[in-house]
Design a protein with these regions (language model features):
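Extracellular/periplasmic ligand-sensing ectodomains of membrane signal-transduction proteins
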Residues: 331-385
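A short, polar/charged loop-to-alpha-helix boundary motif
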Residues: 63-81, 260, 264-266, 348-371
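Catalytic core of bacterial c-di-GMP phosphodiesterases, primarily the EAL and HD-GYP domains
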Residues: 87-159
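EAL-family c-di-GMP phosphodiesterase catalytic domain
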Residues: 1-38, 42-55, 62-69, 149-154, ...
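Sensory/regulatory domains in signal-transduction proteins
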Residues: 43-49, 54-66, 114-123, 183, ...
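Extracytoplasmic/periplasmic sensory segments of membrane signal-transduction proteins
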Residues: 296-351
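Short, small/polar residue-rich loop motifs at catalytic or cofactor-binding pockets
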Residues: 39-41, 326-329, 404-405
Length: 426
């Protein structure tokens, strides 16, 4: 790639990448001298939780002042150059450095490259031909390269969108970086159609300690999967973070817990941590599943009994008495085959009824006389498996500000198909 400012005397071009003297027994380190700094590359391994191995490495810039031999953080380095053209030139120089340092490495892995969106949006930025030539010069196929763009700095710019399309046509993959931080929104996912979305480290930090945040993270991952994206969770630095990533069903994980960035590729370093995370996940999943089944069994048995009693002519209050005796149970209701309620609710007791009715913030949702619940998982699950009790995942009920689960069963009563539902608060 040729920097946009190579022909400008104000921004001198970087020197070509060169092999520096390596430590004893090591391979030569490829570096680039640029405006008084020595640029080098470190590679952070990225693991597939499913494949149980490294599937790529992210190239991270390291810089040292040539005059003082003092390391300079990348953000400080970029802040030290004046003007967009200079930053564009530095961005291009770092890309060239990473390609040169990665050349000859494992062709079956991805190379993740950070590119500032302004570099791609700039009409004088590296064109698709220059990128293709730079890859070819280092014997790298476009399919090996994942171009990472920072989600928080994406421009609403036709030139940027065109460059993204050109990169994809060339064969590169596109990754949306730091999703879930700041003003993240799914419009950028819809617009750019990235193959990979990287969740910001703040997502895993919250999900590690907050069950509510963990549920949101899991649903975010599920939605991104449905959008056609693979999901990477950044910032895995602890056992708990690795376990959280597995629980949230993410695809890829980097992070110091699995391996620190280094000049050489070290994809095997994190396999022990990966095995440990899977061992914990397997043990905890088995325990959680057993406890959940034990906890739900009385509710399922009671809703099945209630359906038999209803079919035999009992009132909903009488039929659901046993279900409503269980801890957390709030109410039962009966739906027709279109999801409409056919009789009034059966409440656990007067107190439960009053508590549900007292949530004034949700008073506009209280009247369900014309409601249809056929879209809900508890209705669809029951309809798919008649006469077998179903249990939903926890969700926010429209009947008030609370999390609950619903137990449901479809059955026939006098020639009518009905679905009996029972809600219980968590």
């Amino acid at each position: 790639m040729t920097a946009a400012t190579d022909s400008s005397p104000a921004v001198p071009p970087p020197a070509a990448a060169r092999a520096a003297v390596a430590p004893a027994g090591g391979s030569p380190l490829v570096t680039t001298d640029y405006l008084g700094y020595r640029l080098a590359s470190h590679f952070q391994p990225i693991y597939s939780l499913t494949h149980h191995r490294a599937v790529g490495h992210e190239a991270l810039l390291r810089a040292t002042s040539i005059a003082t031999d003092v390391p300079v953080p990348p953000m400080e380095l970029f802040a030290s150059v004046d003007g967009d053209d200079a930053r564009l030139s530095l961005d291009c120089a770092s890309l060239r450095q990473h390609l040169a340092a990665y050349a000859g490495k494992d062709a079956d892995e991805w190379l993740f490259l950070n590119v500032h969106p302004r570099s791609l949006a700039s009409p004088v930025g590296p064109g698709i031909g220059e990128i293709a030539a730079a890859l070819a010069a280092h014997d790298l196929r476009p399919e090996q390269v994942v171009i990472e763009v920072l989600e928080s700095t994406l421009p609403d710019d036709a030139d940027f969108d065109r460059r993204i399309d050109e990169l994809r046509e060339l064969g590169c993959l596109v990754s949306l970086d730091d999703f879930g931080a700041g003003h993240s929104n799914f419009d950028r996912v819809f617009r750019l159609r990235p193959e990979i979305v990287k969740l910001d480290r703040s997502v895993v930090v919250r999900a590690e300690v907050d069950a509510h945040a963990r549920r949101i993270a899991s649903q975010m991952v599920s939605l991104l999967h449905e959008c056609g994206c693979l999901v990477l969770m950044e910032g895995i630095e602890t056992d708990e973070g690795a376990y959280t990533a597995l629980r949230c069903d993410v695809d890829f994980v980097p992070g110091w817990h699995f391996g620190r960035p280094a000049p050489a590729l070290a994809g095997g370093a994190g396999l022990h941590a990966l095995r440990a995370a899977w061992d914990r996940f397997d043990r905890q999943s088995a325990t959680d599943d057993r406890l959940w089944q034990e906890q739900m069994s009385p509710y399922k048995q009671s809703i099945e009994l209630a359906s038999v009693l209803l079919a035999g002519g009992a009132s909903i209050d009488e039929a659901c008495r046993r279900f409503l005796s269980h801890p957390g149970s709030d109410m039962c209701y009966l739906l027709d085959k279109q999801g409409r309620q056919v009789v009034g609710n059966a409440f656990r007791d007067v107190v439960a009824h009053q508590q549900l009715e007292s949530v004034q913030r949700f008073a506009p949702l209280r009247d369900t006389g014309q409601a249809r619940w056929s879209r809900r998982a508890y209705f669809r699950g029951a309809a798919a498996s008649p006469n077998i009790a179903q249990v939903t995942r926890p969700y926010m009920t429209l009947q008030g500000s609370r999390m609950c689960f619903t137990v449901s069963i479809q059955f026939d009563m006098g020639g009518r198909t009905l679905v009996l539902c029972g809600d219980a608060s968590l």
